[in-house]
């Protein structure tokens, strides 16, 4: 943070304030649902709710909508998914996560979305990019879109960025 200019630090403070407001809204929305654990939602529940809100409750890989019970029910069908596999990027940040139907997540495996779909199913790849482009603009859609459309060799550059941020 010391390397950043005053303007950059102010911008980051504003982003952090906006994120906290979104987290408070998510907590309030979760408490409206008749689920005992939502009286005091866990951070993982809040994150899932934010990811669902960001994606407009739609799986980017299948384009199918999902609901609260698909995410939080006794037998959830939707999981938190690392866009760039965590094993390849070491990135467990919010920006590298989305919600996806379990079946699509399993099929994607340890590949980037581009590696998985670009060559094998261009139509599905284009649909996915369309879904991600339509994510809620209150979130950092551009940065997420970059991860969804990343070239085969790009995860290494992400790892370098991540490492530099941590130093």
Regions found by a protein language model. Give the residues of each.
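Short, charged surface segments at domain edges that flank catalytic/cofactor-binding sites
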Residues: 1-67, 90-92, 138-159
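Short, well-ordered alpha-helical packing segments
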Residues: 48, 52, 56, 63, ...
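Histidine-centered nuclease catalytic patch
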Residues: 64-99, 108-115
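Domain-exit/linker segments immediately C-terminal to small folded modules
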Residues: 94-167
């Amino acid at each position: 943070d010391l390397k950043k200019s005053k303007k950059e630090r102010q911008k980051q403070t504003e982003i952090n304030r906006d994120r906290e407001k979104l987290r408070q809204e998510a907590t309030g929305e979760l408490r409206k649902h008749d689920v005992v654990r939502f009286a005091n939602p866990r951070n993982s529940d809040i994150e899932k709710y934010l990811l669902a809100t960001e994606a407009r409750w739609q799986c980017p890989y299948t384009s199918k909508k999902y609901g609260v019970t698909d995410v939080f029910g006794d037998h959830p069908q939707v999981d938190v998914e690392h866009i760039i596999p965590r094993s390849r990027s070491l990135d467990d940040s919010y920006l590298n996560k989305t919600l996806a139907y379990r079946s699509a997540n399993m099929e994607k495996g340890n590949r980037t979305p581009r590696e998985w779909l670009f060559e094998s199913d261009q139509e599905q790849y284009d649909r996915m990019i369309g879904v991600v482009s339509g994510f809620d603009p209150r979130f950092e859609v551009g940065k997420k879109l970059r991860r969804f459309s990343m070239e085969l060799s790009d995860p290494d550059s992400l790892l370098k960025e991540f490492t530099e941020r941590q130093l």
